[in-house]
Amino acid sequence: MKKILILGVALLALAGCSKMLEDIRPKHAIPAETVTVDDLDKLTNGLLYQMENYAVSAWTDGDYLAENFSPGPGFDYADVHSDTEATSSATAKSRWQAAFTRINSQNEVLKTANGAAEGGEAVERAKGTALFCRAWTYFQLVIRFGNVPVLTESTMEIVPISPESKVWELIEADLLEAEKHLSAFTSYAYPSDEACWALLAKVYLWRGNRTEAINYADKVLANKAFQFKNTSNDYASLFINGTSNPELIFALSNLRNTSQLRIFEKMNDTDGSFNYSMETGLRSSLFADADVAGVSKSGDIRLQPTYNPAEDRRIIKFPNGGENMGQFISNPDASQSPIVIFRLSDIYLTKAEAQGNTSEGLATMKKYMDNRYETVTLPTTMSAADFRELVLDENQREFYAEGRRWFDIKRAYIQDKTFDLDKVYKTWNDRDYLMYWPIPQDERDLAGHDRYPQNPGYAE
C-alpha cells in the first residue's frame, strides 16, 4: 500500500507515491510501481532540481531579516522583523511547507534505492544524494524553527514536533551515512564527500562542537583541488554560467530551459523592478578599508563585483547578463547561473570561528584574508569579542546577498546570550524570541496544538 505524509501542503499529494515521483522529475514522469534501478539517476537529479527551487525561494531570507537591504524600485517595507513575527507569517509557512514536500520526496527516493536488488553506482548515488539533501533541508528548517517533526519515512500519521536536539541528531546521522555512499569530489555540480564534510563542519559549529567542526573543515581542506583565487574577476566568476572556479565545493547547476530560476531578478533585474538594494549605510561601509582592534585591511577584492556606485540601487553580485547597467563581469547565460551552496570560504570561516581567538584561529583568518585583500595585517592576539566581530564581518563581506547574515548573528547569539541584538539591528526592540521563527498556525491547527506546540514568545 502506498503511503505519503500528511503535513500541510502535502495533503494535496494523497493520489499516492506516483504523484510525488512525478513532482521530483521535471521531464520524465515514471509511474511509481514501475520504477527500476535504471530510473534512479533521474530520481536523483530530481532531488537536486527540487533543491534548486528551495534554495532560490529562501535565498534572501538571511539578508532581508538582517537589515542588509533597502527597498528596491519594485518593493517597499518598514520593519523587516515583523515579517516573521506573526504566527500567520507567509514566509514561515512557505519555508515550512516547501521543506516538508521535499523531505517527502527525499524519503521516497531513499526507500526506492534501499529496495533495489542491484544497481551499483546508481543506487549509491541515489542513497547518498537523498540523505545529503534531507540533511540540508532539515538544516534549513532547524536554523529557522528549531523544533520540527523528524520524518525519516513517509507516513499517513501526523508526526509530533521533536526537540531541536533530535533534529540536529538526524542531520548529523544523515550526513555520516551519506558519505558512505557518495564519492570524492569530481564536480561541484553533485554532492560529494567534501560537500558532506562542509555541511557537517557547519552542523558541529552550530551545535558548539568546535573540535569536530575543525576536524571536518580540515577533511575538506585536505583536498587540494580547492584553491583560492585572489582577484576581483576571480571572485565575480563564482556566480556566472559556465564557471570553473576552483573555490567551488558544491553548487546547484540550475541548467533549466523552463521554469528558470534567476537570483539576479531579486536585486539586479534588467527591467529595473527588483525588490532589494544594498542598505544605504552599507554602501560606503561594507567593503571599506578598516583599521580596528589591531586589524588593518585594505583593497577588498569583493567590492567591485558586488556594488557599483554608478548603479547604486543595484547589487551586481549576480550578473544579469545585460549591458550598460553597471555589471562588473559578463555572464554568458544569466538565467542558467549556478546556485552556490558551499565554497572554500565557507570552510576557512567555519574553521576560524571554531578555533576562536587562538593563534590557530588567527592563522586561519590570515590565510583566508590574504586572498581577499590587497593588504592585511592581523595582531598576534585578540579578545574573544574582537575576534568574533572579525569573523562576523568577514562572513558579511564574503556572503553578502547570499542569505547568511541573519543566521550568523543567530549563531553568535545562541553561543553567547550576552550578545546584544539591539546593537546589531536598528528595529529589533528586544524581540529576542524572533531568533526562532513561529510554527505556522495553519500547520498547528491541522496537526493539533498539543502535537505542534508554538515556539516561546508567540501568541498561542
Question: Which residues does each PLM region occupy?
Answer:
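Membrane-proximal, proline-rich intrinsically disordered regions
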Residues: 17-60, 421-460
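Inward-facing hydrophobic residues that define packing positions of alpha-helical scaffold repeats
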Residues: 103-106, 168, 175, 217, ...
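Conserved, well-structured interaction surfaces
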Residues: 41, 76-145, 157-163, 179-186, ...
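Short, surface-exposed recognition loops and adjoining beta-strand edges that mediate ligand/DNA contacts
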Residues: 30-34, 57-72, 184-266, 378-385
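Flexible, polar/acidic helix-loop-strand segments at domain edges
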Residues: 287-344
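Sec-dependent bacterial lipoprotein signal peptides
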Residues: 1-16
